UniProtKB/Swiss-Prot annotation:
Organism expressing this protein natively: Scheffersomyces stipitis (strain ATCC 58785 / CBS 6054 / NBRC 10063 / NRRL Y-11545)
InterPro entries: ARM-like (IPR011989), ARM-type_fold (IPR016024), Hsp70_NEF-Inhibitors (IPR050693), Nucleotide_exch_fac_Fes1 (IPR013918)
Protein name as catalogued: Hsp70 nucleotide exchange factor FES1
Record Pfam families: Fes1 (PF08609)
Lineage, opening ranks: Eukaryota, Fungi, Dikarya, Ascomycota, Saccharomycotina
UniProt-listed Gene3D superfamilies: Leucine-rich Repeat Variant (1.25.10.10)
Primary subcellular site in the record, as a coarse category: cytoplasm
CC annotations in GO: cytosol; endoplasmic reticulum
This protein's record includes keyword Cytoplasm: yes
């Protein structure tokens, strides 16, 4: 504040040497001095633009971008609920909304709830999880929207059991399937969602869902010598996690895993040794 006062005095006196020496003041300090809007106000203003039917698509995209930067701050993310802004964000996931705004909405959700138990709890009370699962389950969903949707779901479920319960209730396991989709970016996001599911442990119901979804079969299908190394490593890590939680592998799953491990033997020096050893113990 002293520096700001010195800068103000130098401006009034026209002392160019002092102005040059002091440099430009902190913009946030200037906002406080001259009554600029605080961050909660900026958040409200951004949402107002997004909801304004007269605003251009470009203006709405800019507003969403600014909003996401603001809610990277934990306090601001928690203020989404305090200011009753969750419904406005979730509404942007609707089918009739322009595609870019749906992508922004999913991205904002993922950023807000990531490693944030309060925001996870607040979001889980909305219709957002159901809408995200619907988007992720639709084969016609564009890739960029699918990626952000899976990111949001993963962030919402990680270390938060109620979100997984919501996931099951809305048939979320349908998004983890033996799809012919070979896009490694989508696979990585699907695997991240599985990792989030396992972050809250394993019980009988979850084991049953894993078997019904043929998750192990899906994981093993990724273990190929020509596969994407990042996907292979993530799949191995999940298999290792399943073993850690005492998942009961069937004889068929073990046989297929053995075949998969043979496929990636030549890649062993590029994979995490601990996960590889854990997977090999399952088939030994």
């Amino acid at each position: 504040m002293d520096k700001l006062l010195q800068w103000s005095i130098a401006q009034q006196s026209g002392d160019k040497e002092a102005i040059q020496k002091l440099g430009q003041p902190d913009p946030k300090m200037l906002e406080q001095l001259f009554g600029g809007p605080d961050e909660p106000t900026l958040m409200k203003q951004a949402i107002a633009v997004i909801q304004n039917p007269e605003a251009t698509l470009e203006d709405k995209e800019i507003a969403f971008d600014n909003f996401e930067m603001l809610i990277e701050n934990l306090d601001n993310a928690n203020n989404i609920e305090n200011m009753k802004l969750w419904p406005a964000i979730v509404n942007q996931l609707e089918d009739g909304v322009p595609a870019t705004l749906r992508v922004y909405a999913a991205s904002v959700i993922g950023t807000a709830v990531q490693n944030n138990p309060k925001a996870q709890e607040d979001f889980n009370k909305t219709s957002g999880p159901e809408k995200l699962i619907k988007i992720a389950s639709d084969e016609k969903t564009p890739k960029d929207l699918l990626l952000k949707t899976l990111y949001a779901l993963s962030s919402a479920m990680r270390n938060f059991k109620p979100a997984y319960a919501n996931f099951v209730e809305n048939n979320g396991w349908n998004i983890i399937s033996l799809s012919k989709e070979n896009d490694h970016k989508i696979q990585l996001r699907q695997l991240s969602a599985v990792s989030s599911i396992l972050s809250t442990g394993l019980d009988e119901d979850k084991q049953e869902n894993i078997q019904n979804a043929k998750l192990v079969e899906y994981l093993v299908s990724i273990l190929t010598k020509d596969g994407h190394i990042g996907c292979i490593e993530k799949a191995l890590n999940i298999i290792s996690e399943l073993a850690h939680y005492k998942y009961q592998f069937t004889s068929t799953e073990i046989a297929r895993l053995a075949q998969g491990l043979e496929q990636i033997e030549t890649l062993s020096d590029r994979l995490t040794e601990e996960d590889l050893v854990s997977a090999k113990k399952i088939v030994s």
